[in-house]
């Protein structure tokens, strides 16, 4: 039976439960344990796939094609375990499963209720996702006191009652606000948060106290006294300059030792080696170079919509000890002739998106980068914009467009995918009338790269696998015409039916590459990703006046 660490939050949301949990997971992993993570989200959507990026932020995609919460991105950036749809569960999915079972008659005519049917389904999902691991960390979304979270809290209370303290731990992250007028930290919100948690039958084993500054020992003792938590288990989580330094901070305070002692794992663990995290922090704090990258998107007012893109760019810089400064630009603002916002930029990245708003701005951005020889990296919609730009302005296909934006276009160079193979080899089909949710080409897909191309050079191998999330694709009817006009198709699906990567010849542009996949989902601070490393290096070379630079690894 896998020992479980349940991570809850109190007082306010967005305190960083996911980062704290992932940091602890990375320490336990460094000590030799096989670790996994899971997110329980209280919203009634089945998954975040159809939620607005302005409300929810990024939709993170796993290898098996699950559309999940962005916290799974945090998890995979901190731990080596690759997650799946089992690791992201919502209230919507729980109710969907229970109702499906009720319709099949699985409950034998019983009245279906929150307790025991909903809570049992939650526990079943937890068991399924965590089986076979040494330790599992499970984050409960939302804040204690929210009505939506109650079924999840009741389910984990039941787990603790049945398994005992040696197999289930409660970790509660709470706010200790600093009141500037009084010049002191206030512990009362934490006391009330724990009181709320205890009222539903959960006594925390560990408190993570988020604050602007380190919580002094006197306040930790006070919190311990009023919350019935050991002083040793009251952990200070102050604001830090580099988030990737959180594993080092939690290790310093001995959080991992609390877990090992409670779960009696001493005979399974070794000393923690966090040298990779120390190297990451050092590279962030002591860069040797810096570049300015423009990110031209549709949801830039809510930057969590591009969380993995921003992190992957920074990772690409870390591998070269280069600070990456991001300039966020709204695509709609670039739909005219004024491209002054892109002056003095070392590289341009156009990320994914849906719908016609801002698409023309992305096309204009591609045209600017192509003509001005600025390194360009297009992802998903950014690739489609680059193809439309090339079709219109180089191949002379007037009014070329994507059918997503103009179904009457005389040259639909981007069209709806009607049939494709999933990661497991199964054929999926869709049409214009299909549901939006869960009907895209999703998950890890292999692609073959063309020898002698930029893509092949950057990746360093012939076959690569990337995660996808898209409904529209390069229209094969225009392959030959655009290749004859000079566009290089450097990556194709293994069955040769889908275009995966396009680029410009190196003799016409220093670095212009666009891919249909989402490589940002496979980038980590310790390893980076070849495309982002190559793009940042190209930006550095542009800044250096075209001089070829040797990579300085972190």
UniProtKB/Swiss-Prot annotation:
Provide the residue positions that the database annotates as binding ATP: 14-19, 71
What GO cellular-component annotations does this UniProt entry give?
Answer: cytosol
Q: Which E.C. number(s) belong to this protein?
A: 6.3.4.2
Q: Where is the Glutamine amidotransferase type-1 domain?
A: 292-545
The segment annotated Amidoligase domain runs over: 1-265
Single GO MF descriptor? CTP synthase activity
Q: Which PROSITE patterns match?
A: GATASE_TYPE_1
Positions annotated to bind CTP: 13, 146-148, 186-191, 222
What function does this protein fulfil? Answer: Catalyzes the ATP-dependent amination of UTP to CTP with either L-glutamine or ammonia as the source of nitrogen. Regulates intracellular CTP levels through interactions with the four ribonucleotide triphosphates.
PANTHER family registered for this protein in UniProt: CTP SYNTHASE, CTP SYNTHASE-RELATED
Q: What else is known?
A: CTPSs have evolved a hybrid strategy for distinguishing between UTP and CTP. The overlapping regions of the product feedback inhibitory and substrate sites recognize a common feature in both compounds, the triphosphate moiety. To differentiate isosteric substrate and product pyrimidine rings, an additional pocket far from the expected kinase/ligase catalytic site, specifically recognizes the cytosine and ribose portions of the product inhibitor.
Q: Which family does it belong to?
A: Belongs to the CTP synthase family.
The annotated subunit structure for this chain is:
Homotetramer.
Recorded protein name is CTP synthase
Give the originating organism: Xanthomonas axonopodis pv. citri (strain 306)
Taxonomically, what lineage is the organism?
A: Bacteria, Pseudomonadati, Pseudomonadota, Gammaproteobacteria, Lysobacterales
């Amino acid at each position: 039976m896998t020992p479980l660490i349940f991570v809850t939050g109190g007082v306010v949301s967005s305190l960083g439960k996911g980062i704290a949990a992932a940091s602890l997971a990375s320490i336990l992993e460094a000590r030799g344990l096989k670790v996994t993570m899971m997110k329980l989200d209280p919203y009634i959507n089945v998954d975040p796939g159809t939620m607005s990026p302005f409300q929810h932020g990024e939709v993170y995609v796993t290898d098996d094609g699950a559309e999940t919460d962005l916290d799974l991105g945090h998890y995979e950036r901190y731990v080596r375990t690759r997650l799946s749809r089992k690791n992201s569960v919502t209230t919507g999915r729980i109710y969907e499963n229970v109702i499906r079972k009720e319709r099949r008659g699985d409950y034998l005519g019983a009245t279906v209720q929150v307790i025991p049917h909903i809570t049992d389904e939650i526990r079943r999902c937890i068991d399924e996702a965590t089986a076979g691991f040494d330790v599992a960390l499970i984050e409960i979304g939302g804040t204690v006191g929210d009505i939506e979270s109650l079924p999840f809290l009741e389910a984990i209370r039941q787990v603790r009652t049945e398994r005992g303290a040696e197999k289930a731990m409660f970790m509660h992250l709470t706010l200790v606000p600093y009141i500037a007028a009084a010049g002191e930290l206030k512990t009362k919100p934490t006391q009330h948060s724990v009181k709320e948690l205890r009222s539903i039958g959960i006594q925390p084993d560990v408190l993570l106290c988020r604050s602007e500054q380190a919580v002094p020992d006197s306040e930790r003792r006070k919190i311990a006294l009023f919350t019935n938590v050991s002083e040793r288990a009251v952990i200070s989580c102050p604001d830090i300059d580099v988030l990737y330094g959180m594993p080092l901070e939690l290790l310093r305070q001995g959080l991992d030792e609390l877990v090992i002692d409670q779960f009696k794992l001493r005979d399974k663990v070794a000393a923690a080696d966090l040298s990779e995290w120390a190297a990451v922090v050092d590279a962030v704090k002591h860069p040797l170079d810096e570049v300015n990258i423009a990110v031209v998107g549709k949801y830039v007012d809510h930057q969590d919509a591009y969380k993995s893109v921003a992190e992957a760019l920074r990772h690409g810089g870390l591998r070269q000890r280069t600070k990456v400064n991001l300039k966020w630009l709204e695509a709609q603002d670039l739909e005219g002739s004024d491209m002054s916002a892109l002056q003095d930029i070392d590289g341009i990245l156009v990320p994914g998106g849906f719908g016609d708003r801002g698409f023309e701005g992305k096309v204009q951005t591609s045209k600017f980068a192509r003509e001005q020889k600025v390194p360009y990296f297009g992802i998903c919609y950014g690739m489609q914009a680059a193809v439309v730009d090339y079709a219109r302005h180089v191949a002379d296909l007037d009014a070329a467009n994507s059918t997503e934006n103009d179904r009457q276009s005389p040259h639909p160079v981007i069209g709806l995918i009607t049939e494709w193979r999933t990661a497991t080899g199964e054929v999926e089909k869709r049409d214009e009338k299909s549901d939006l949710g869960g009907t895209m080409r999703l998950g890890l897909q292999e692609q073959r790269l063309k020898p002698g191309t930029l893509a092949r050079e950057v990746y360093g191998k012939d076959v690569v696998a990337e995660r996808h999330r898209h409904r529209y694709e390069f229209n094969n009817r225009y392959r030959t015409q655009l290749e004859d006009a000079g566009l290089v198709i450097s990556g194709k699906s293994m069955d040769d039916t889908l275009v995966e990567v396009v680029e410009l010849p190196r003799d016409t542009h220093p670095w212009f590459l666009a891919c249909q996949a989402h490589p940002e989902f496979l980038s980590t601070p310790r390893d980076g990703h070849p495309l982002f490393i190559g793009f940042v290096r190209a930006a550095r070379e542009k800044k250096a006046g075209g001089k070829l630079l040797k990579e300085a690894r972190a």
